Amino acid sequence: MTATPANVTLKDLNDQWAMNWKLCDDSEPMLVAQGVPWLVRKLLGLISMQVALKTVPDPATGLTHFFAEYKPPFGLPSSGEERVLDFVAEEITVPVFGTLRVSTRWATPKELDEIDAYLGEGFEKGTKEVIHMKTENSELGVVTHQTFGFEKIKGVRYHTRHIVVKRGGESTRLTLVYDYVGPQHAKKS
């Protein structure tokens, strides 16, 4: 268990984390709601994913670019995504989840209250904004909201994600918790 340093913020991310399964909520109900097949759910529950996150402000537009690279174990290929925090939806296809419309933005806890208060709860004191990602799977009628931020659990600062999955009249909520691995290193050319 490694705490995320206090100087690491969402505005200047360039760091890596590893999922802490002991502190995460059970992801099974979320994956069921998202239509993930049983075998894939079981496999996902056995691996510990690392994630590298980076935020880069664009001085020309004033918008922030958000990069996430997901690194599974055992030498499996990593996957990544880039989002502009402008809340403009773009269509992507993800093998496990199908075709999705994804939009990402900075959001205040008050803005998140309008969707579900869970999305903005629990983050460290003084949090003014978090990263909010919304994904829509129109084929399954599933809308997933997740927020990226930091919170203290038993006095230790972690990167966390609060997730709300809505399908029909049902909502599933969970928090994913990540241990700090360290800063990303520049790739050598």
UniProtKB/Swiss-Prot annotation:
Biological pathway: Mycotoxin biosynthesis
Keyword Isomerase tagged: yes
GO MF annotation, one: isomerase activity
EC number of this enzyme: 5.-.-.-
Annotated transmembrane regions: none
Domain of life, per lineage: Eukaryota
KW Isomerase (keyword) present: yes
Keywords for this protein: Isomerase, Virulence
Function (record text): Probable pericyclase; part of the gene scp cluster that mediates the biosynthesis of a hirsutellone-like compound that has still to be identified.
Family according to the record: Belongs to the pericyclase pydY family.
Protein name listed in UniProt: Probable pericyclase scpY
Organism the protein comes from: Mollisia scopiformis (Conifer needle endophyte fungus)
